[in-house]
Amino acid sequence: MHTLLVAANPAPRSLTHYVLGRLEAALKPGSVEIADLAEERFDPRFTPADRRAYHDGGNYPADVTAEHRRLERATDLVLVFPVYWWSMPALLKGWIDRVFVNGWAFEYSPASGLRPKLQGLTTHLLPIAGDDCGAYERHGYESALRTQIEHGIVDYCGSQRGSTAFIYRSEQLAPEATVRAVDRAVRTISEAIRARANAPLTKFHGRA
């Protein structure tokens, strides 16, 4: 089992990074790798080169190929991110746009239709929300976010749905309450990953 933690927050002292560190510690001594997209200066822009690679199903830019290699090592992927305007930050969205592409995460053609390729990967979500749980339920924000990511991305690529653990009221809680909220979310994700450790593994079929 190997877990890839992907974080998208430009502030190194953010709650996102605190959660990232707690999650890494909770998963040890298991195999864990961190992709801090802001620190690594990942370029989220979908360029003409990305568009050509998307339509051709190959010849990916070097930085995209490097992300493919990281994902191919992983059995579990955890996306840790602050919720911006009821969705993921542009940096993380750009990572998805550029990395989860035709020919690698899935194959599609009008003749053969869709063939998902990430069956060997389980994807977990840890969104950090500023508002409370009631607001997310009342306005359908949680359902919309989960539909967009879990169904629109995870299911489409054939990845298995893992656990989703929201941290609510991230800018309003007292420090002690914040720690408790982080404890719950980290425990939910880490226990889900450990519970899979003895389950039969499916070979990862991302494109080399």
Show which residues each predicted segment covers.
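FMN-binding flavodoxin-like domain, especially the glycine-rich phosphate-binding loop
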Residues: 73, 90-208
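N-terminal beta1-alpha1-beta2 submodule of the flavodoxin-like/Rossmannoid cofactor-binding fold
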Residues: 1-104, 176-208
